[in-house]
């Protein structure tokens, strides 16, 4: 994607594990992305804000946006994208739910959310 503007929505590791990876992942995003949005993925019983802050410390030379609500983070990336931009969304893949505190699960599908939000963004631009 050389020559393309890259906007990255970066999920993290799930709550309660692999905290050491968080700043490393954000540092890699800083290296390869022009804009970075840090968001929620699967917090389980860990504070999602703490997870995102743990990622943010890995970004040294850019100012990432921190948006807890994953749909809002995706929408923001799409709203700021121009024709030809690359929007990379990481973290959930095909996972069917977001896992929250006390075993809660929210049904989730990144691909469907992107489609829904892109339709809204494109509709607003007409």
Regions found by a protein language model. Name each.
Residues 1-126:
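ATP-dependent carboxylate-amine ligase
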């Amino acid at each position: 994607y050389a020559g393309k503007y890259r906007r990255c929505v970066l999920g993290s590791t799930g709550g309660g594990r692999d905290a050491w990876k968080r700043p490393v992942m954000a540092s890699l995003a800083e290296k390869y992305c022009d804009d970075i949005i840090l968001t929620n993925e699967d917090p389980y019983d860990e504070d999602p804000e703490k997870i995102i802050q743990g990622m943010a410390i890995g970004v040294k030379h850019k100012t990432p946006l921190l948006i807890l609500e994953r749909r809002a983070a995706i929408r923001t990336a799409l709203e700021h994208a121009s024709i030809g931009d690359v929007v990379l969304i990481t973290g959930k893949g095909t996972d069917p739910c977001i896992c929250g505190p006390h075993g809660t699960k929210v049904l989730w599908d990144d691909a469907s959310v992107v489609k829904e939000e892109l339709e809204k963004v494109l509709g607003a631009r007409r």
